[in-house]
Amino acid sequence: MDGYAVRAEAMEKRYGEKRALDGFDLAVGEGTVHGLLGPNGAGKTTAVRILSTLVRLDGGRATVAGLDVARQPREVRARIGLTGQYAAVDEVLTGRQNLEMFGRLFHLGGRRARLRATELLEQFDLTDAGDRGVGKYSGGMRRRLDLAASMILAPAVLFLDEPTTGLDPRSRGEVWESVRALVAGGTTVLLTTQYLEEADKLASRITVIDQGRAIADDTPDGLKNLVGGDRIEVVVAERAEIPRVVKVVARVADGEPEADETESRVHAPVTDRVTALTEVARTLQDEGVRVEDIGLRRPSLDDVFLRLTGHRTENTEAKEAA
C-alpha cells in the first residue's frame, strides 16, 4: 500500500451546479490519525462518504487499504469502519446485545459474535456496563460503544466523522483515549472534527479543506508555523493604556504589535520568549500600567484556520455568538 492507508487524487463530486469536491487530494499514512479540518460545507463529510463507498465520486481516483473505492467497493467495505456524529446503537438493548447484534449482521455467527462482543467490551473499558441498557449510558460511554461496534471486523481503516460532537470535555477525553488505543494497535484513523483541540491532540498530520480543495497539509506544529512562532500577549485593565503597551511590546517584538481594543489586548511575535516576557512585565510595572494578564502562547490551529480560510471554525463562531 506504499505506506498510505488512504489516497485520493483529484477527487471530484458534483451536486447539480455545486462542486462539493473540486480536485481534492489526500494521503493518510498507515497506523496514524489524520485530521481533516474545514469550514461548514467545505467537503469534509462528502470526502468521507466517498472514501467509505457510501457515495460515488464523479472524477479522480481514491484508494483505501490499497483497494479502489470505485472498482472494488465491496472489498473496501470489508476493510473499513465508520462512525458518524451520532451513536448508531439501540438504547433498549444492553451494550453486549448491541455488539452481538452487529456481529451477527456481519455474519460472524452466534458464538463468534458473543466472543467478539466480550473482547470489545473489555477493549473499550465497558465490561462492567456491558449488561446494562444503553439508555442508561453516559454520552461518552455511548460513543465508546459506537466505536466498539465499528471495530467488529477489526478494520484496517476507521473513518470518524465528528465523533465527539455534543460531548462534554470528560466524555471527549474518554473517546480520545479509545482512539489512541486503536492507533497503537495498528488501525489507521481519518478524523473529521469541529474541535481544533481534538485535532491538535490526536492527529499526527492534518489536511485543511476549503471549497472542496485541500489548501494545506502538514503536522499540527507545521501548520501553526504558517502564522508565526511564539507570541507575547498583554491584556490591560484600561483601554486607554493600549498605546503605551504597544510601544513597550514593540521594543522586544519581531513584528508590528497588533491591538484588539474590544478585548484590551496587545500581541506580537517574539523570538527570545523569556527575555521578552520579563522585560515587558517589568517595564509595564515600572510605568504603573495595570495588567490583567500577560503571557506567551503558541499559535493555535484556530489561528491557522482563520489565516487559511478567512474565518474561524463553526465551533469557535458558535461560542463567540453565545
UniProtKB/Swiss-Prot annotation:
It catalyses: daunorubicin(in) + ATP + H2O = daunorubicin(out) + ADP + phosphate + H(+). It comes from the Bacteria. GO terms for biological process: daunorubicin transport; doxorubicin transport; response to antibiotic. Residues 6-236 form the ABC transporter domain. Induction: Expression is repressed by the HTH-type transcriptional repressor DrrR1 in the absence of daunorubicin. Pfam families: ABC_tran, DrrA1-3_C. InterPro entries: AAA+_ATPase, ABC_transporter-like_ATP-bd, ABC_transporter-like_CS, ABC_transporter_ATP-binding, DrrA, DrrA1-3-like_C, P-loop_NTPase. Its EC number is 7.6.2.2. ATP binds at residues 38-45. Keywords: Antibiotic resistance, ATP-binding, Cell membrane, Membrane, Nucleotide-binding, Translocase, Transport. The keyword Magnesium does not apply. The keyword Membrane applies. Part of the ABC transporter complex DrrA2B2 involved in daunorubicin efflux. Responsible for energy coupling to the transport system. Confers self-resistance to daunorubicin, an antibiotic produced by S.coeruleorubidus. Belongs to the ABC transporter superfamily. Drug exporter-1 (DrugE1) (TC 3.A.1.105) family. The complex is probably composed of two ATP-binding proteins (DrrA2) and two transmembrane proteins (DrrB2). This is Daunorubicin resistance ATP-binding protein DrrA2.
